[in-house]
Curated annotation (Swiss-Prot):
Positions of the UniProt region annotated as Acetyl-coenzyme A carboxylase carboxyl transferase subunit alpha: 265-571
Name used for this protein in its record: Acetyl-coenzyme A carboxylase carboxyl transferase subunits beta/alpha
EC category: transferase
Domain named CoA carboxyltransferase C-terminal: residues: 295-548
GO MF, any single term: ATP binding
Primary role: Component of the acetyl coenzyme A carboxylase (ACC) complex. Biotin carboxylase (BC) catalyzes the carboxylation of biotin on its carrier protein (BCCP) and then the CO(2) group is transferred by the transcarboxylase to acetyl-CoA to form malonyl-CoA.
Length: 575
């Protein structure tokens, strides 16, 4: 049994001859250069075929790889619909820059492109569109005379055929070798885009990695709607230039898509896999000549003749109840395909103001809403329903956009008031509210505002200069909060209940003074008991009223709105 333990082991003798020589049988197998790709963000090695199947998105860290213009065509454009324009337009050497012609030829051979942008007409899920796609492989997507000319011709094509325009940006900025000819393309394209806007046509930009320099400072940031792929580098000046100028290290995430969205310059960050669907939906939301489908079948709710027993304080308490439906509850139940857009294009995005486009019975409608939270975390995110200046500026931007595309506007009001804080004052809270008031009175599209909860002071009025102002039965609309009223007049905020009952803040009070146009009665005296029924009441009233308002010509609409506010006030001549 133990003999095997002590059995002598036999070894094979190996010659040391040629051990130091290279054994060709041990060489690594030859792997084609394009078989594997390395993610620059996480360092993972990815099988290229799998990467392409995944829209060139890293499956480990979700990094979006840079892709060619023609790969973009395959991903976005319906098969068989792409018709390229101006393919043979090529660069010359206006400054006789040494070596420029040779570099152009090498770039053309390497990329199979004639220039840094391809342009054409194609369909995105059936929506015919003029499309420009930049390619950073060609001179880093820099903008010279040809890029400027091809994009300008595309804009003119959009105007001529009344088609929307989509531009995918990917650029290092100006083409150094073309000097001032390059710089002037920024003005040339912007001038053409001005004509596109005057024609009332949609322009969407999709910012991809990288979008910098003169492209950022011109057509990239002029879209009616600005989308971006996640993590894209977007900025005007380069990071090194900024660091050298300010002699400081820049923060992590600086000049990314996420950074720009936080600061109010991007409407939406969209994963590449969802880009085609997102673009298609935006294009559908901007179709011309839409009509309400079921207008003739609509019946609005009858007036509830039973007296509501709640006093003003009771209604205020109900309006503030955390179970009361929020603006987003109504948006989800009333509108189809609601798409939210972000940013004021100046400073930031205020999550207290929700804005976007949705479909109301077949008609695209711009929706602006003040949103409260249901718990502490959500209330912190929504700033307890108190908008900052950037919220009002975002609202005005979207309302101006609605005017351009002839869309009616509905505003949901639910705020204790505009945010009172040092930073809000520094950023011009008063100016932001004032600009909304003066602009809303002259918007050439119908506007309906609905107070669904609290309507607090100028913070509510900033979204209420409308053709029709409605209130839910248990909503309130006031000069300021009863607590503030009691503090100012009686220096005792504990008298808020008494203040509420003398301030005339209920829907019945305000309707009796003709300060609002309609009361929407709540199911079972409480909207929170049946959100769907309440939503249906609002929806039917909106369809009916918008249909009436859209029949008015421009002058009649604006005159009626002006006169609505002109006659407000109680006074007499002293005898």
């Amino acid at each position: 049994m133990f003999k095997r333990l002590f059995k002598k082991t036999k070894y094979i003798t190996v010659s040391s001859h040629n051990l130091n020589e290279k054994d060709t049988t041990l060489e690594k197998p030859l792997i084609p250069d394009c078989m594997w790709s390395k993610c620059e963000k996480c360092g993972q090695i990815i099988y290229s075929k799998d990467l392409r199947k995944n829209h060139s998105i890293c499956g480990f860290c979700k990094n979006h790889f840079r892709i060619s213009a023609y790969d973009r065509v395959k991903q976005i454009i319906d098969e068989g619909t792409w018709a390229e324009m101006d393919k043979n337009l090529c660069s010359v050497n206006p400054l006789n820059f040494k070596g420029y012609n040779d570099k152009i030829e090498k770039a053309q051979e390497k990329t199979d492109l004639n220039e840094a942008v391809i342009t054409g007409v194609g369909s995105i899920k059936g929506e015919k569109t003029v499309i420009c796609i930049m390619d950073s492989r060609f001179f880093m997507g820099s903008m010279g005379s040809v890029v400027g000319e091809k994009i300008t011709r595309s804009i003119e094509k959009s105007i001529e055929n009344r088609l929307p325009l989509v531009i995918f940006t990917a650029s290092g900025g100006a083409r150094m070798q073309e000097g001032m000819f390059s710089l002037m393309q920024m003005a040339k394209i912007s001038a053409a885009l001005s004509k596109l806007s005057q024609a009332g046509l949609l322009y969407i930009t999709v910012l991809t990695d990288p979008t910098t320099g003169g492209v950022t400072a011109s057509f990239a940031m002029l879209g009616d709607i600005i989308l971006s792929e996640p993590g894209a580098l977007i900025g005007f000046a380069g990071k090194r230039v900024i660091e050298q100028t300010i002699n400081k290290k820049l923060p992590k995430g600086f000049q990314t898509a996420e950074f720009l969205m936080k600061h109010g310059f991007i409407d939406k960050i969209v994963n590449r896999k969802n880009l085609k669907d997102t673009l298609s939906m935006i294009l559908k939301l901007h179709r011309e000549k839409c009509e309400f489908k079921s207008y003739k079948d609509i019946t609005v709710n009858k007036v509830n003749t039973l007296k509501n027993k709640l006093d003003a304080w009771g209604k205020l308490s109900m309006a503030r109840n955390e179970k009361r439906p929020t603006s987003l509850d109504y948006i989800d139940n009333i509108f189809e395909n609601f798409m939210e857009f972000h940013g004021d294009r100046y400073y930031g995005n205020d999550s207290c103001i929700v804005g976007g486009i949705g479909i109301l019975d077949g008609v695209p409608v711009t929706i602006i809403a003040q949103q409260k939270g249901r718990d502490l975390n959500e209330n912190i995110e929504r700033n307890f329903g108190m908008p900052n200046p950037e919220g009002y500026r975002k609202a005005l931007r979207l309302m101006k956009q609605a005017e351009k595309f002839n869309r009616p506007i509905v505003c949901f009001i639910d705020t204790p008031g505009a945010y009172c804080g040092v930073e809000a004052e520094q950023r011009g809270q008063g100016e932001a509210i004032a600009k909304n008031l003066i602009n809303m009175i002259s918007l050439e599209v119908p506007i309906i505002s609905i107070v669904i909860g609290e309507g607090g002071s100028g913070g509510a009025l900033a979204l209420s200069v409308s053709d029709k102002i409605w209130m839910l039965e248990n909503a309130v609309y006031s000069l300021l909060s009863p607590e503030g009223f009691a503090s100012i007049l009686w220096r005792d905020s504990t008298k808020a209940k008494e203040a509420a009952n003398i301030m005339k803040i209920t829907s019945e009070d305000l309707k009796s003074y003709s300060l609002i146009d309609k009361i929407l009665y709540e199911p079972d005296r409480d909207a929170s008991k049946n959100v769907k029924v309440m939503s249906n009441i609002i929806k039917n009233n909106l369809i009916k009223e918008f249909n009436n308002l859209m029949d008015l010509d421009r002058d009649e609409l604006l005159n009626k709105r002006y006169n609505k506010f002109r006659v407000i006030g109680e006074y007499k001549n002293k005898t």
